[in-house]
Swiss-Prot record:
Gene name, Swiss-Prot/TrEMBL: Lrif1
Name of the protein this chain belongs to: Ligand-dependent nuclear receptor-interacting factor 1
Free-text note on domains in this protein's UniProt record: The Pro-Xaa-Val-Xaa-Leu (PxVxL) motif mediates interaction with HP1 (CBX1/HP1-beta, CBX3/HP1-gamma and CBX5/HP1-alpha).
UniProt keyword Nucleotide-binding present: no
Source species of the chain: Rattus norvegicus (Rat)
Origin superkingdom: Eukaryota
Record carries keyword Coiled coil: yes
Gene Ontology biological process terms, A to Z: dosage compensation by inactivation of X chromosome; regulation of DNA-templated transcription
Function: Together with SMCHD1, involved in chromosome X inactivation in females by promoting the compaction of heterochromatin. Also able to repress the ligand-induced transcriptional activity of retinoic acid receptor alpha (RARA), possibly through direct recruitment of histone deacetylases.
């Protein structure tokens, strides 16, 4: 079967030799290749006839579109006999413009490969004028000859008419058969595989015509095939202006009565087709019923739907409809419910190389339904299809556990496996109200009309079964295993804050709800026992917990604090007067803290390592602050000491506010700012000195640890050096700006 469009160019004797007489001229078919790469058949005139013409058997069908005007070209159709009922072709011919009114006799045949072979052609004079177009046809030895009349034309432009393979004149008018203008596949058309059960009843009758039905009148789920649905498709609307409207006649229907049923066809010629429009690809397809062909004209504006369409068009029609298409296998007789809604757009349905047109307004293809907040709600909708038994989806829905929705923002949901023997994939589920669950629905044609109802579940998004097809297409993700479908959702909140009112259970089966409640209750009890028995854990358990924490936070190295001693010349400066007064009390407090730390267990030391890393960074910043204090005391930068406020920690600033609360007198804004910054410098130096006094004890404590002492990283040192240089440059620039401000102030 082929859908290639073959164009035949007819060159008359006038074009070849300049003679005005073309009577008795025969044509020879020469296959060529056009400029666009398509195969063409060129007819060249020959001087003599190669044989006698077969007499014409009158079987006229009158067309009243010309109304006696002999200068109007007509759209005609010739019929060819095909050797196989599953193959046909369509040919596009230009309208001939001879000098005289001529009757052309064309006799053609088509072999199984789909290539046109014109066996004999001839011309004869016809007495003008004519008032009607006559059509004749006869079948002799699997050959059909079609006679049509073409009036002369004085127009210079080239007109075209399309010669289609006729189709059936029987009662085949339905929503699945194309009629009217051709179809266009837009660029945004979607090609997706769907099951045949949600499709309209007429389409199911075509697809599921040979599928065996049970005694109850329903089709088993194991017999439901998969089809490919292309949507949307648009009808081509051609606007005809006044100049060309009188050229084309009204639609003419040609029918034959002497053709056997396996090749009897019917074609409607569409009125208003513009001659300059792009030729329409006529793709021939056959329905499931043998001997009933149908033409589906398609003009694609997108390469992807066109390629997919042509791929299924080229497939040969199989005798058994279920062969070559994987079916959905089930093992039980449980029922599931579906909802079908009217289709909004036209669509093409492809199944085993066959094409059906699905008109909009018919019922089928389940849509997304707005879910309710209740546990389940019944929504009855009328549908022309009956529910089919699908045990697989029902079994999956029973095994999938509902997620726990917690309204508090502080709660965090995470998934864990139900047991060691049934692992489940880890997934973080967000408790959003807008998330819904889409469940597949299965239904088939039935003479009874029932009201459908479904249970609407508001859960997190879960993808259910998606069968994979042998053609390379699949409906979505792979089908998950049964063990992975069982998920245990456990929240990481405290056991004391979780109550049954904050958890909403939504599922179809009460047994599943009870199972989920028992799992959550067990988890709460475990957390409660763990909370009240923390003091009884051994060092081994603490070491295990430490290893887990380090793994969670990505800590791969041991944390160390490197301390250096403060220079001696700083102790003689005026900035350490307050430190000398508070040195004894601060040192006592530090000793108390160190003794308490020493009494702590081994696990407490290890848990405090992240905090010690923060102390290391804090102390390095304080060292930089002490360097700047030296520069300030030396007189290099007095006015720019405000920079220290951004370096000191927040806790030091808070303590500084407490220390300076005794100040009752206030100077102007500038003097107050300098005073505060000066005291902040003193506080920073105080913290640095306290750390330096404790350096010996810290070094001793860390050497007693089981981990070796490692120097600070090189990258940190380089980074700190760069920061120090940048701050130095900033201080110099600010000093220069301050000098400029002073000069400007003096000038004013």
């Amino acid at each position: 079967m082929s859908n290639r469009l073959q164009t035949v160019f007819l060159k008359t004797a006038e074009e070849k030799s300049g003679s005005h007489c073309i009577s008795g001229c025969m044509y020879q078919v020469v296959p060529t290749i056009g400029t666009d790469g398509k195969k063409l058949l060129q007819l060249l005139p020959i001087p003599k006839s190669s044989g006698n013409l077969i007499p014409v058997v009158q079987s006229p069908v009158m067309s009243h579109g010309l109304k006696g005007n002999t200068e109007k070209p007509v759209q005609v159709t010739f019929q060819t006999q095909i050797s196989s009922s599953s193959t046909s072709a369509s040919v596009q011919l230009p309208v001939l413009q001879p000098a005289n009114t001529t009757k052309y006799f064309l006799t053609g045949t088509i072999d199984t490969s789909g290539k046109d072979r014109v066996t004999s052609m001839g011309t004869g004079n016809f007495t003008p004028p004519i008032s009607n177009t006559q059509n004749h046809g006869v079948k002799i030895h699997r050959l059909t000859r079609q006679t049509f009349t073409i009036p002369p034309s004085t127009q210079n432009d080239s007109s075209y008419f399309i010669v289609n393979t006729p189709s059936l004149p029987a009662n085949v008018n339905s929503s699945t058969l194309p009629s009217g203008p051709p179809l266009t596949i837009p660029a945004h058309a979607e090609v997706k595989p769907v099951l045949a059960s949600p499709l309209p009843p007429l389409v199911q009758q075509k697809i599921l015509g040979t599928v065996t039905t049970s005694t109850s009148g329903t089709v088993e789920a194991s017999q439901i095939p998969a089809v490919f649905y292309v949507s949307p498709v648009n009808s081509v609307k051609i606007i005809v202006d006044k100049k060309t409207q009188n050229i084309y006649h009204k639609p003419v229907t040609f029918s034959t009565s002497q053709i056997p049923p396996n090749v009897a066809t019917k074609t409607q010629l569409n009125s208003g087709q513009h001659p300059q429009a792009a030729p329409v690809n006529l793709i021939f397809q056959e329905y499931l019923q043998p001997g009933i062909p149908c033409l589906v004209p398609v003009k694609s504006s997108n390469n992807v739907p066109s390629k997919v369409f042509n791929t299924f068009v080229d497939r040969k029609t199989l005798g058994d409809n279920t062969v070559g298409t994987p079916l959905l296998s089930t093992n039980s007789s449980s029922r599931t419910q579906s909802i079908s809604v009217p289709i909004k757009d036209d669509g093409l349905i492809m199944f085993n190389g066959k094409v059906l047109l699905n008109k909009k307004g018919t019922y089928g293809l389940p849509s997304k339904i707005d879910q309710q907040n209740s546990v389940s709600s019944d929504i009855p909708l009328k549908d022309s299809s009956q529910v089919v038994s699908s045990s697989l989806v029902t079994e999956i829905s029973r095994e999938v556990l509902s997620s726990v929705l917690v309204k508090s923002k502080s709660f965090q949901l995470k998934t864990k496996s139900l047991s060691n023997s049934q692992p489940a994939p880890m997934a973080h589920i967000k408790p959003e109200k807008s998330e819904k669950v889409e469940r597949p629905s299965f239904s088939v044609t039935s003479p009874h009309t029932t009201n459908q109802s479904t249970h609407c579940l508001k859960q997190s998004k879960i993808v259910f079964i998606n069968p994979v097809f042998s053609d390379g297409f699949r409906t979505g993700q792979n089908t998950p295993r049964k063990e992975n479908l069982i998920q245990n959702i456990r929240s990481s909140v405290d056991a004391a804050t979780v109550t049954s009112q904050q958890c909403v259970f939504r599922d179809q089966e009460p047994q599943t709800q009870y199972e989920m409640a028992s799992i959550l209750k067990k988890d709460i009890q475990e957390r409660s026992n763990k909370k009240y028995s923390q003091g009884n854990h051994t060092k081994a358990s603490y070491l295990k917990n430490d290893a887990e924490f380090k793994k969670i936070f990505g800590l791969t190295k041991d944390l160390r604090v490197c301390l250096t001693r403060i220079p001696d010349h700083l102790s003689s400066t005026k900035s350490f007067d307050s430190f000398n007064n508070l040195k004894s009390s601060s040192y006592k407090d530090a000793n108390v803290v160190m003794k308490e730390e020493k009494k702590q267990s081994f696990s407490k030391k290890r848990n405090a390592k992240p905090m010690k890393k923060m102390d290391y960074t804090k102390r390095r910043k304080i060292e930089n602050a002490s360097d700047m204090v030296m520069n300030v005391m030396n007189g290099t930068d007095v006015a720019n000491s405000q920079l220290l406020s951004s370096i000191l920690p927040i806790s030091d600033i808070a303590q500084h506010n407490i220390i300076t609360s005794h100040s009752t007198t206030r100077e102007d804004k500038r003097t107050e700012t300098e005073h505060c910054c000066h005291e902040k410098q003193e506080k920073g130096t105080l913290s640095s000195s306290t750390s330096f006094e404790q350096s010996n004890y810290f070094n001793k404590n860390y050497t007693e640890d089981i981990f070796p002492v490692t120097p600070p990283e090189l990258e940190e040192t380089i980074r700190d050096e760069k920061i120090r240089r940048l701050k130095q440059i900033l201080r110099e620039k600010e000093a220069a700006l301050e000098e400029l401000r002073k000069k400007m102030h003096q000038k004013q």
